[in-house]
Amino acid sequence: KGVTHLAAAAFFNAIWDLISKFHKKPLWRYIIELKTRDLLDKLSFSYIDDVITKDEAAKIIDQKKTNLPSNLDDLNSTIFPAYTTAAGWLGYSDEKMKGLVEENLSKGWTHFKMKVGQDIERDIHRCKLVRELIGHENKLMVDSNQIWSVNETIENIGKLKQFDILFYEEPTNPDDVLGFKKIKDAHPDVNLATGEMIQNKVMFKQFIENKSLDYCQIDSCRIASI
């Protein structure tokens, strides 16, 4: 856990990088082109095989592979969804936020994430400003960086829902599986996001099994490698 996993990630991710360079192809392509069983043999199912077995994982992967283009080179021209936080940092004036939102809209951005958590009334004002600028055809997300308690999260989500938030990222302590469940039970119609601070697969198992995680934000260093 923690530092141990970060240290392991430095080693294992470097090996993956070497494998990629040896085969003269990007790592994503090397992984996609692996036979399903070869890929699964590189993974450990310890502590999670009570919710997903290697055979079940194989079926999922094989099903997903049917959606791949016949020519993987086509993926090089595919635009994958991404978001920008450039306009949403705390401390920005309304004028600066407006300018940055308009600038990023002109560059083609359609998904915007903003930081919240210092003052809920200011958060409401800022969300209203950004939503009006980007319209309802674009997506808005918020990240409170774990600052709220469970009860504060439940209350504040109730105040921010009017702005059609795609997901609420790390609204409370990222280790609090039961807390996320309480939030989800209070607001079953909203999406919760977390994962960049989760250190192991068992935590992910708990979040996913109790249906309190909608957007899984994996950090390939914190969990000891890809």
Where are these regions (language model features)?
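Catalytic core of soluble alpha/beta enzymes
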Residues: 113-226
